[in-house]
Amino acid sequence: MKKMGRFMAVVIAGLLPSLAAAQDIKSYLPVTDERLLHPEPENWLMYRRTYDSWGYSPLARITTKNVKKLAPVWTFSTGVDEGHQSPPIVNNGVMFITTPKNQVLALDAKRGDLLWRYRRDLPEDLFQLHPTNRGVALYGDKVFLATVDAHLLALDARSGEVVWDQVVGDYLSGYYMTLAPLVVRGKVMVGVSGGELGVRGFVQAFEAETGKPVWKTYTVPGPGEAGHDTWPGDTWKTGGVPVWITGSYDPQLNLTYWGTGNPGPFVSEGRRGDNLYANSVIALDADTGALKAYHQYHWNDAWDWDEVSAPLLIDVRRNGRSIKALVHAARDGYLWLLERGADKISYVHAEPFVHQNVFTKLDLETGRPTYDPQRIFGVGRRAEFCPSVWGGKDWPPTAYSPQTGYLYVPANENLCSALTGKQEEYRPGQLYLGVDFSAIELLPSADAKDHIGELQAWDMSTGKKAWVAKFKSHNWGPVLTTGGGLVFLGGTNDRYFRAFDAKTGALLWQQRTNSGVTGVPTSYEIDGVQYIAVQSGWGVDAQRKQELLDKAFGTHTFVPQGGVLWVFALAK
């Protein structure tokens, strides 16, 4: 009875959000399927701007020649601490950003004036590991938000008022959401977080107009479903495999591509088997949610190597052959090149982009790795492995430039980890790791004193690394590429936001901000002026990782918190 009372209080609180409207937006351009398929160069309408997840803006007024004149033109303090990771989404001069704790801000993208603000009242008994949010989706005259208490909201784009509110999961069972929704053909798609809390992951689609559920596809197959036999006993019920980063979409195949997270608990000996569809890319029919194809990057994961970053859809010409590719820089430290088809995902090539000592070889036909058993920890058995639990690259997205043909990877080198397993009993809504969370070890190599963070450029036509920029700090920075031949990146603990020459890797410009820049940068144009926008606000795993590095090095690194949106343009 007590539990029901808490639940009713949460429902009531969810119906009473905090909304501050400075002014309604009188002129708002509705977002259509056509505009999402072919966005205007001056706008940034979705998480990575285009369905192929390139993170590329064709705008070219800011170039390698004049970027040194880039300067702040306005800033906006969000009033919130913790990790700010969402991209500034821009539609016809109106900007939408989100912050931790599910605040949505609508701003005049030219002047920085507040148009409206939405704050969600979150339940007091909510438990999650990541209060962050990675942005909104747009469709019609609505703004869609996936919340940390596992609701999907449709807000009126002009006023911020709630149009509909749909429950996606039970937060008391460990479900929460941090991703930006994906809108395809009138459907809003989301995945869930909670892989460390014993959830059963899924992707679900809803009608954009009404919020009515359309389909739901579990990432851990149940009885009678293909792949169920890769989970012993009842382990599938608490198998994890969350989906917490926005997917990609191929309109020709009508398939959405999603990266999936780790199985649970971390210690793998109690769930022996491949544990499908963990640590994979899955292809789902956009209309029905039917699983059409998958590729598992690594099986029976024991290193917390989520592979949730959606692959980039790139046409690659390699060894005289044209490939409709899926490209993924993985947390497991390998750069994967796959080929996508209507009902198949085929392995083409993979190689490590950071030091990796777990895989001893890959099958030449399938890409399936063979493991060094000494790198697999167990109950009461410690094992060291490289890269670390945060991987060669965590969630911060890569970007691609069609000008250079390069993929740009925000990597972390010279870091390993150690884990020791323990027996763990599943309790709904609580940590289900099989390890002591406070005893996770981060082990810098000798070369870490030289550098940890990297920005790598990989030539997709040759499969070779073209250049690398190195940083003493670890790197938690999403990447933006532009038509001006530039690559933008933050992510370091020195609080700088930087611009590099996309072809050579030369550092051309940098600006120190209030905090660490962990937000996804975007670019847009108004009245002939190109802008670069990014949120600065350190926290969540960037800070957790920094604390472990300080412990390993015997240092103390202070990175101020507090979210600020920075908007830059060329000085006149």
What are the residue ranges of the model-derived segments?
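Blade/loop signatures of beta-propeller domains
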Residues: Q23-P72, T219-A226, P369-R375, P444-S445, ...
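N-terminal cofactor/phosphate-binding cores enriched in small/glycine residues
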Residues: S53-G169, T481-T482
